[in-house]
Curated annotation (Swiss-Prot):
Keyword Disulfide bond among record annotations: yes
Family the UniProt entry places it in: Belongs to the neurotoxin 19 (CSTX) family. 08 (U8-Lctx) subfamily.
Keywords: Disulfide bond, Secreted, Signal, Toxin
TM regions (residue ranges): none
Main location, first listed in the record: secreted
Gene Ontology molecular functions: toxin activity
InterPro entries reported for this sequence: Spider_toxin_CSTX_knottin
Tissues of expression: Expressed by the venom gland.
Domain of life: Eukaryota
Positions annotated as propeptide: 21-26
Name the UniProt record assigns to this protein: U8-lycotoxin-Ls1f
Length: 77
């Protein structure tokens, strides 16, 4: 009986470790991908940069994209 309980605990520990490793190894988001729901998932050379959307002075939403660190984007007319 003790052997069955011990085996079950060992299997549970192994499955837990596998799940933790899978979470740590998730793929990062490449440049220009939307990161609104996952701001920490951009690749290491990128940052999740967010912009508010406005219509007639009222905020209607927010967009976030993985962009290069240190780069400033300006609107062109």
């Amino acid at each position: 009986m003790k052997l069955i309980i011990f085996t079950g605990l060992v299997l549970f520990a192994i499955v837990s470790l596998i799940e933790v490793q899978a979470d740590n190894e998730r793929a990062c988001l490449p440049q220009y991908q939307v990161c609104t729901d996952a701001p920490g998932n951009c690749c290491s050379n990128l940052v999740c940069d967010c912009y508010g959307r406005y219509k007639s002075g009222a905020r209607i939403g927010r967009n976030c994209f993985c962009l290069q660190k240190g780069v400033i984007y300006k609107r062109e007319n």
